[in-house]
Curated annotation (Swiss-Prot):
Name the record gives this protein: Large ribosomal subunit protein uL29
Lineage: Archaea, Nanobdellota, Candidatus Nanoarchaeia, Nanoarchaeales, Nanoarchaeaceae
Keywords: Ribonucleoprotein, Ribosomal protein
CDD domains found in the cross-reference section: Ribosomal_L29_HIP
A biological-process GO annotation: translation
A GO CC term attached to the entry: ribosome
Length: 63
């Protein structure tokens, strides 16, 4: 997900997407802790997407 696309979304949409990604990350982290097979690349991408969303939300709060 690109930051440019995120900037076009409303704050409510960003918060909903953030909650969804955090839940997905929680599930992947559980698999990681239990040494189950999962997609490492997806885990990394989710963490980056969460960081991008938080960055966009902070930009809007400062503006």
């Amino acid at each position: 997900m690109k930051a440019k696309d995120l900037r076009q979304k409303s704050v409510q949409e960003l918060k909903e997407l953030l909650a969804k990604l955090r839940e997905e990350l929680r599930v992947l982290n559980t698999l990681y802790i239990n040494k189950r097979p999962f997609n490492y690349g997806r885990r990394r991408q989710i963490k980056r997407d969460i960081a991008r969303i938080l960055t966009v939300l902070r930009e809007r709060n400062e503006a």
